[in-house]
Amino acid sequence: MKFSEEKNVSNNPTNFEGGLDSRKVGENRRALGVINQNLVVEGRPYPCVVNKRALSERNDVCEKKQADPVHRPITRRFAAKIASTKTSNAEGTTKRSNLAKSSSNGFGDFIFVDDEHKPVEDQPVPMALEQTEPMHSESDQMEEVEMEDIMEEPVMDIDTPDANDPLAVAEYIEDLYSYYRKVESTSCVSPNYMAQQFDINERMRAILVDCLL
């Protein structure tokens, strides 16, 4: 026993610096081992990789939930929807029963009508053979009324009172002729008009002519 203790002492020399032994003891502490065990989740080390469900699986789950309305909480909206569906189904069944009663005779048999052996009078007339009546629109009627009004209005002739008075007509023509003879000299443009305009050059004349044309 003494020999073994001496052997252990001789094999494990004391470290006066205290750095190496403290580092080895710190690595094998129980607290660190417990922390490492806590990080292991279901046999997978941290960080964990989460396996997400595919989109099709989610849709299947949602459809199953919608198809099973027993476990769905009954809200006001859901209750109103159920009531409306029940009433619509009841109305549909009553309509079907009424149609069945109306289409059957007293013996309960249905009456079938053959469309192929209808009389000629009951068959519809083709559109090409139908007699189309002319449709007069309101605009056409208004145009006809306006034209009639224009034709009915007489045109006033202001020269009818002087038709048999040759002197009045002659004096009127002579006055016009004398007036235009007096004004003719003032209205005519002098032939050297452009030569007298010193501010207008040849280029400006060309531009002016192009604009006038």
From Swiss-Prot:
Example of a GO biological process term: cell division
The keyword Protein transport is annotated on this UniProt entry: no
Bridged cysteine pairs (disulfide): none
Stored InterPro entries: Cyclin-like_sf, Cyclin_N
Gene3D superfamilies reported in the protein's UniProt record: Cyclin-like
Region (Disordered): 1-23
Organs and tissues of expression: Only expressed in organs with dividing cells.
Record key words, sorted: Cell cycle, Cell division, Cyclin, Mitosis
Family annotation (Pfam families): Cyclin_N
Family stated for the protein in its record: Belongs to the cyclin family. Cyclin AB subfamily.
Subunit organization: Interacts with the CDC2 protein kinase to form a serine/threonine kinase holoenzyme complex also known as maturation promoting factor (MPF). The cyclin subunit imparts substrate specificity to the complex.
Known function: Essential for the control of the cell cycle at the G2/M (mitosis) transition.
Name listed for the protein in its UniProt record: G2/mitotic-specific cyclin-1
